[in-house]
Amino acid sequence: IDLRIEAGQTIGIMGGTGSGKSSLVQLLARLYDVTKGQLLVGGHNVKEYDVKVLRDQVSMVLQKNVLFSGTIYENIRWGNEHATDEEVQRVCKLAQADGFVQEFPNKYNTMIVQGGNNVSGGQKQRLCIARALLKKPKILILDDSTSAVDTKTDALIRKAFREEIPNTT
């Protein structure tokens, strides 16, 4: 395919099961390399980037998200271990997670069990979106990552992205 995405642009990639949507986004983070042609990010072939440097610029949130045993603060900080409580809370607001977190008795100090089985699928997705945002990526990839949230919440997440992180691709 021939595709050009400008910095700060939001696009959607649609297609049937097995059409290559997930494969395409995985190429951006060099989970594997293209075998023909080239993939450019910032005008440079992704193969020229140090993998760590490239991956520091890209955050991916997948449909099947992973949460770890620990508090909500600890889970979100996997995106940036040096983040302040305020930074964690800010990204949770953008991801529409702050509302339900505030309802937990221990709020951000609520313990999440391994795999996140003590929160709903939609809550898990929003916490993982918050984690990805905390990294402050230049490229944010959402691979069917709001499939478990209702349409109103999905719209609020997208609105927050447009207003608060307009330069993120």
Regions from the language model: what does each represent?
Residues 1-169:
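ABC-type nucleotide-binding domain
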